[in-house]
């Protein structure tokens, strides 16, 4: 029996104005476990891509999707992306009537996509969960505990994606996540970005050596390693101890 991606992903029935980058597709095709942990550099397009992935899966499978952000406002950013995808697809296909609430989207097949923060009363919700930037939350442990409760049923999965932070609690929770046998762990650094060959619609490179050098000059060595090379500061401290 062949393993299947964590979430169904096809651009054929949900067209978008521009294709995603190959490295973003790998976040989907490389995920074969119930839990997916992506440690990524800043501004890698994770919210944007996962918004599409979740919408696609909800339309095809009827599964609920839940975006859990450090604040309700950060989760609602994903709702903006999804609304744009729906508008783009409307020019090519009929998706049916989609109901839009303040913090949710209800699809014609009954699937509901929620956008919540860690203080939300989410006990009654269930679905595939996307946890954005948990390492920068006031309590990473609390966010992850909420996500586990929301995605506990066998047919659901959880995706945790973040840039590393100096928070010791975040480092501890990250280690717990990747230690599980049911977890696929992935990393996407600035070096990976530069090697990806990703280009803009104009044909210009999205990431190149000049960009790498400019960013290194603007940040301290410690911040560069943490924010763009996905190195947890606590890992260096443990190795030095």
Go through the PLM ranges and name each one.
Residues 2-241:
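Phosphate/NTP-binding elements of NTP-utilizing enzymes
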């Amino acid at each position: 029996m062949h393993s299947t991606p964590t979430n169904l992903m096809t651009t054929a029935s949900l067209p978008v104005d521009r294709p995603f980058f190959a490295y973003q597709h790998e976040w989907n095709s490389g995920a074969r476990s119930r839990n997916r942990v992506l440690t990524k550099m800043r501004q890698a397009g994770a919210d944007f891509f996962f918004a599409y992935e979740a919408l696609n899966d909800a339309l095809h499978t009827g599964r609920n999707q839940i975006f859990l952000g450090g604040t309700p406002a950060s989760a609602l950013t994903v709702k903006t992306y999804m609304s744009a995808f729906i508008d783009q697809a409307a020019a090519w296909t009929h998706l049916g009537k989609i109901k839009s609430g303040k913090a949710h989207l209800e699809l014609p097949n009954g699937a509901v996509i929620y956008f919540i923060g860690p203080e939300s009363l989410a006990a009654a919700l269930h679905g595939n969960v996307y946890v954005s930037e948990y390492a920068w939350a006031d309590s990473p442990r609390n966010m992850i505990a909420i996500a586990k409760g929301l995605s506990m049923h066998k047919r659901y999965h959880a995706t945790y994606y973040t840039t590393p932070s100096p928070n010791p609690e975040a480092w501890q929770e990250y280690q717990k996540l990747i230690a599980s046998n049911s977890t696929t762990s992935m990393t996407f650094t600035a070096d990976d970005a530069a090697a990806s060959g990703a280009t803009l619609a104009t044909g210009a490179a999205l990431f190149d050596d000049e960009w790498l050098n400019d960013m290194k000059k603007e940040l301290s060595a410690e911040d560069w390693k943490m924010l763009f090379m996905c190195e947890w500061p606590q890992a260096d401290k443990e190795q030095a101890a």
